[in-house]
Amino acid sequence: MISASRAAAARLVGTAASRSPAAARPQDGWNGLSHEAFRFVSRRDYASEAIKGAVVGIDLGTTNSCVAVMEGKQAKVLENAEGARTTPSVVAFTADGERLVGMPAKRQAVTNPNNTFYATKRLIGRRYDDPEVQKDTKNVPFKIVRASNGDAWVEAHGKLYSPSQIGAFVLMKMKETAENYLGHTAKNAVITVPAYFNDSQRQATKDAGQISGLNVLRVINEPTAAALAYGLDKSEDKVIAVYDLGGGTFDISILEIQKGVFEVKSTNGDTFLGGEDFDQALLRHIVKEFKRETGVDLTKDNMALQRVREAAEKAKCELSSSVQTDINLPYLTMDASGPKHLNMKLTRAQFEGIVTDLIKRTIAPCQKAMQDAEVSKSDIGEVILVGGMTRMPKVQQTVQDLFGRAPSKAVNPDEAVAIGAAIQGGVLAGDVTDVLLLDVTPLSLGIETLGGVFTKLINRNTTIPTKKIYTVCIGELNPASSIGIPPAPRGVPQIEVTFDIDANGIVHVSAKDKGTGREQQIVIQSSGGLSKDDIENMVKNAEKYAEEDRRKKERVEAVNMAEGIIHDTETKMEEFKDQLPADECNKLKEEISKMRELLARKDSETGENIRQAASSLQQASLKLFEMAYKKMASEREGSGGSSTGEQKEDQKEEKQ
């Protein structure tokens, strides 16, 4: 807070100027920056070292995440351990403390709904009291709680996790996928965020990258990344619109592509509108119909709700290619009369009616973006669709009606953002040349003085990085003394404040006393967010989880090896039982029994112990089978010798 006196104060806030005055609360913009939001640091380091190694591009999505790397001049989307090109952004904790990420976590969600976290990107960088968060608390089976700093966190088995931590676990999975493909460690990354994310949300995403062990070189906007994926190999100049309706957020960006320069003209959106809302709307419809038909209210049964939620998501996807689908969930619940089954037919028209209001919510941001960019729909040469929800025919029709042209399907809506992030990584590493990305800040930054007068310093849709200098007067009772400004009569000291938004869209401030020339760098943080100690502790926890994952993988591989050796040994013992000494067979059977006892307590054993025991069993079995082989070879030689002798006798008799 920069205070003029007891009676006059100026405080830094951000606002989404495109919103209504009633909605333009401080937390809607740069998350209510205040006196507590300043952290003073001695200097700001702008130096950047040469980037070593590959730079991975990661789309950290609400529903699914994707990772890509540059191979030469082309970006390649990588498959995860399950063979899929996208990974569910789902993290679960089992009763025994095991952490699951991706598809394994999603598969067990029905039986463990309270400890399975999904769509936590909608919580990242948000306060618990935000209306959107309060709305989410009623829609998800897991607990959303107020952290000590006032942020929204989640709880599993009595432990609290920040949304940045959950995002970090997903990023670790992406990092592992990249490392498995590259064959070496991947440290550098470009991570994407919704274009309409504010400062707190962007910083929280960077925190997630740091917790996961990544060096986040840049945070870029998802529509901009998709534009890079679309336009990298295009030679013609044109204005394009990127309509990005994903799992949890909606963005619209207008860009001009000209000779390798990607300039964002404007951006707009809604950070709480996406596929999750479509799923929730359909879920409410199904629950309502089920109650009407059976009289049973499913809202109190988390396990049943999770089954319905998964069925709703599946039906939504099917209706993009079919005009009708069946929703069948046998034994969904039961009452005094017995089990209840869900059998429902759903048409595409019915589904479109259920979600029509959600689709309409994307129209106003698109119109505002065109207005801010000073373009008409006739000026737009291409409309790019990004995000899984753009596969819905009604969404595509809405886009066509809005922009007056059929949208392009030139990019994969699930992969384009990760590809664009990888391209930007290539640009930063110097591997991709002749590409320049000029992005914008989505929200305005300004100063509000006593009386509620708001002065914009940096307007929304200003190209970043950017800076603005503003001079304020400081009175004798002011907190600015902490940066070394001596006490003086009111209005005498003049402080030159520089507001700087970097290429990641994150705000920095520097303050300079024009009288003394003394200068201090200020990094703006929201009153919430993660402290340095929080992040360090989370990094340690993430490393602990990574070590546990490594040990678990080692143990599983050792168990698989041991079970294979047992199976092979028993098979060969049965096959060669006539050639094996009985006493040696009994000894080997005892070894197998000991091995099985060890496997029975595998969870308390290390992979190395299991591997050593399995190797000992294998060596013992090989010695025994070697004996059997020699015996069989000897018998064959004996039978072969007698056969040869008989042939010679026969030949001798024929000659006589």
Swiss-Prot record:
Top-rank taxon: Eukaryota
CDD domains, per the entry: ASKHA_NBD_HSP70_HSPA9
Molecular-function GO terms, alphabetical: ATP binding; ATP hydrolysis activity; ATP-dependent protein folding chaperone; ubiquitin protein ligase binding; unfolded protein binding
Stretches for region Substrate-binding domain (SBD): 442-656
Residues where Phosphothreonine is found: T87
Transit peptide region: 1-46
Residues bearing the modification Phosphoserine: S408
Biological process, per Gene Ontology: calcium import into the mitochondrion; erythrocyte differentiation; iron-sulfur cluster assembly; negative regulation of erythrocyte differentiation; negative regulation of hematopoietic stem cell differentiation; negative regulation of hemopoiesis; positive regulation of apoptotic process; protein export from nucleus
Region span, Disordered: 633-656
Region feature Interaction with FXN and ISCU, mapped onto this chain: 432-656
InterPro entries on file: ATPase_NBD, Chaperone_DnaK, Heat_shock_70_CS, HSP70_C_sf, HSP70_peptide-bd_sf, Hsp_70_fam
Keywords assigned: Acetylation, ATP-binding, Chaperone, Cytoplasm, Hydrolase, Methylation, Mitochondrion, Nucleotide-binding, Nucleus, Phosphoprotein, Transit peptide
Modified residues (Omega-N-methylarginine): R490
PROSITE patterns, per database record: HSP70_1, HSP70_2, HSP70_3
Gene Ontology cellular-component annotations: cytoplasm; mitochondrial matrix; mitochondrial nucleoid; mitochondrion; nucleolus
UniProt catalytic activity: ATP + H2O = ADP + phosphate + H(+)
Residues modified as N6-malonyllysine: K206
Annotated EC: 3.6.4.10
Described function: Mitochondrial chaperone that plays a key role in mitochondrial protein import, folding, and assembly. Plays an essential role in the protein quality control system, the correct folding of proteins, the re-folding of misfolded proteins, and the targeting of proteins for subsequent degradation. These processes are achieved through cycles of ATP binding, ATP hydrolysis, and ADP release, mediated by co-chaperones. In mitochondria, it associates with the TIM (translocase of the inner membrane) protein complex to assist in the import and folding of mitochondrial proteins.
Family: Belongs to the heat shock protein 70 family.
Known partners and oligomeric status: Interacts strongly with the intermediate form of FXN and weakly with its mature form. Interacts with HSCB. Associates with the mitochondrial contact site and cristae organizing system (MICOS) complex, composed of at least MICOS10/MIC10, CHCHD3/MIC19, CHCHD6/MIC25, APOOL/MIC27, IMMT/MIC60, APOO/MIC23/MIC26 and QIL1/MIC13. This complex was also known under the names MINOS or MitOS complex. The MICOS complex associates with mitochondrial outer membrane proteins SAMM50, MTX1, MTX2 and DNAJC11, mitochondrial inner membrane protein TMEM11 and with HSPA9.
Name of the featured protein: Stress-70 protein, mitochondrial
Gene coding for it: HSPA9
